[in-house]
Amino acid sequence: MRKKLIGLSIATALGIMSLTACKSQPAENASTNGAADTTAQAEGTKEEGTSKEASGDRVKLEIWDWWGDGQYKYVIEQLCQNFNESQDTYEVVHVNYPWGDVWTKALAATAAGNPPDVIIQDIRTVTHRAEAKQATDLTDLIAKEGDGFTDQFYPQLMDAMMYDGHAYGLPYVTDTRILYYDKDAFAEAGLDPEAPPETWAQLVEYARKLDVKKDNGSYERLGFFPGTLEWNAWAFTADGKDYTDADGNVYVNTPEKVKMFENIYNDFYQYYGKKELDSFSAEFGNGMTNPFVAGKVAMWVNTPTEFTKVRDYAPDKNYGVALLPALEEGGEQYSWGGGFSVEIPYGAKDTEGSWEFVKFITSKESQIYWASEVYDTVANIEASQDPSLMDIPVFKMALEAMPTTVVTQDRLTAPGASDIVLPYLDEIILGNKTPQEALDEAQASVEQLVQDSK
């Protein structure tokens, strides 16, 4: 019988979000999907938003998240207000806690029988909450909406909502990774500014031409630096496979993943030297010191929302966006993403009311509003494709990337697998182990984890 890991959903989510920071920081003046802005709040302090309190006979509902300031707070509270004005039965109030703390408090509140009514959660750990009875089974509510209700969401995101054939949330936002490239730098290097690399071999070829050295031999600009994408993410983009699946199969040392890390090590860390790359990347930061904004790298991998850094700090930069390069000629151009789900905690006092709000904020109209204001890639397919968003090139590229974006999950069959693999990947970058050696050892460790989790 599988070991019960009741508290793992919170601990795993916090570890995972350091990987995904699911995600990005959409704008300097916005509350981020990570911890940066919200941790300024006093730890453990509950802040209710400005949306109206329950009045008259309305049932008061609370949505919990970490969006405590900036554009994120404004938009979620506007959605609460829009919902409140759309009907006269429920009144939704926005409540935020600091990043991470919100999940710890929700877990405690759920265990105490007084959970929030709706909560924004990590998309990768839905199954943990489902197994631990921390999330409400939405299957019957979804069935009442008629056939095809869940078809409005990207399938890999809806798949992350499922546990034992039942749905325990709806996907809210996601992301993907794309390649940003400096068109002017391409032209200066004799490269076609309208032809970004489509394979790893092209990426390396272009990177060499885009490198610029100073008189002292150090680098003024690198054509490409792989360290702006997490090592685990590079593994997922190699073959489009997570480390494990729901059946406990393990895909750590696949030939494609081995090849990817041979490329990363040989073409960059061995070629330039780890010391040189570490010294060069030590100057990377945010804002004006963002490596792509500052012209320190000519090609850069990040989320679509990161275009706001270029917009705000280098408005005249002539750049393009493209899919991540395929590992081999003719291969898929895979990407990697995470995201957030919207869930009704187990034991919520008015499931029907909570469900009405969940439907409202995942609807096409609400998701278009969210995307247009904070630039997240939303889970609703029609909303993500809306013509009103297509003036922003990164939205078009995100749409193109989504079909081959791997949305990884922290599987119950191998909880924390990514954390186990990561040190082995570090050994590759340090030059202590070959990719084959390191990934073979990581494969064995994750296989043991699967056995231990039964």
Positions of the model-derived regions?
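Conserved C-terminal helix/tail region of periplasmic/extracytoplasmic solute-binding proteins
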Residues: 52, 187-188, 193, 212, ...
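Short, solvent-exposed loop/beta-turn-alpha elements that line the ligand-binding surface or hinge
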Residues: 53, 139-153, 196-198, 214-223, ...
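Extracytoplasmic/periplasmic substrate-recognition and gating elements
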Residues: 59, 81, 85-86, 91, ...
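Long, aromatic- and glycine/proline-rich binding clefts that accommodate carbohydrate-like moieties
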Residues: 156, 160, 315, 322, ...
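Glycine-centered hinge/linker elements that transmit conformational signals in sensory
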Residues: 206-208, 249-279, 324
